[in-house]
Amino acid sequence: MAFPPLSRVIHPSFTGFTDRDLPCVYVASFDGGIQVPASHLIGGTAQSQWHYDQAVQAIERIRDGYALAIPGIADNLACGLWLDNGVYYFDVSTSFHDVADALDFGRDNNQISVYDSESGGTIAVLK
């Protein structure tokens, strides 16, 4: 089971958003994540017209798009948001009980590594 290309999920997710909203999301990385420069979220978001409610709607629509695109995965999706070097990253992920399954899934989806929640570290995905 592989995550579909984000372009197949994100486009319907942004129905109803204006062209003004899309540049601040700057659509996405190829691994299923969204990157939003932190400067767009400072000072009431006047710089980008990106508002909290719109961000929540976008996250919910992307999550729901993946849930529809991958049968049986809806109950195992997680959404994460973190700040690194002035950029907020949003990513959809799924979890596994078995490390081998996680590594296989990561390999199938061209991931560099998987996160091990038990150790708090990452494990390289070897090709």
PLM regions with names:
Residues M1-K127:
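Conserved, structured core segments of small domains
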